[in-house]
Amino acid sequence: VGPENPGFRTSFPIVTTLVLSHPACLDHDTGPGHPERPGRLRAIAEALDHPRFARLRRMDAPGIDRAAVLRVHPADYVDAIEAAAPERGRVYLDPDTPMSAQSFTAIAHCVGGVVAAVDEVMRGGAKNAFVAMRPPGHHAGTASPMGFCFFNNAAIAARHAQAAHGAERVAILDFDVHHGNGTQEIFWSDASVLYASSHQMPLFPGTGGRDERGDHDTIVNAPLRAGDNGEIFREALETALLPRINAFHPDVIVISAGFDAHRRDPLGGLDLVEEDFAWATARLMEIAEKHAKGRIVSVLEGGYDLEGLARSAAAHVETLMGA
């Protein structure tokens, strides 16, 4: 995946793209054989350690912003997650979602990362940002961990943009192979946030049908079938999701950037390649330029084949850079 690949060319000027990470995210120990593992972040870091990414602005994520978390999750839930971390070994909050001694520190820095990303993008310190951190968040509901997720990072980003920076409308596009049931639940009755998702169905967690539209018609789902390729993915975005995001006139766009729809991924059955994620990123950049001064905050979700993840994240970031 090099700069000579015309598939990643965009018409955007060179922009300041911020990448946030923190070494504590490597210490969230999910145990042997768990797909949501520290090697995911190492693979992304290695992919971004290339001369063509020299222009990236990089930042270590700060610690938790509790006020930002409490805009999404109740205090007793936040306290319970913090208290659940064991002194040694692992505890399972559900069959897929273990915590180790250092897990809450990683979770806290994820929150700090999305808050800092929103702050920088909304203040103009960066045009857009990619939060390359774990654990992911889009399965976490208001008060429920699920599917590797504890706090909903994308939801925290959206609410922080509104509360701290005056954004009236936030659009979230989620292209993870799994439906972001937690994000959908959180914003089901919120007319100020549009949640748009492409995902495989049937597949975990089982939500995301076209008839799930929210109380204010601000939930838009475009389910795909196993085996669907990039052409079908792009058509779904062009016909079902992107027009709705454009018509919503968002003040900032949040991306739940899951790369497990890649054809190499062991947890999904779609047939996407990295160029498809680059294309989706470029289309969102066009909408962001039109309505949101180009402001995009992208938050890592899934992606469990290390090569597919690395190639996809690199294509995504290279597109964000306007390269």
What are these regions (language model features)?
Residues F12-A323:
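HDAC/HDAC-like amidohydrolase catalytic core signature
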Residues V1-F12:
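Intrinsic disorder/low-complexity segments
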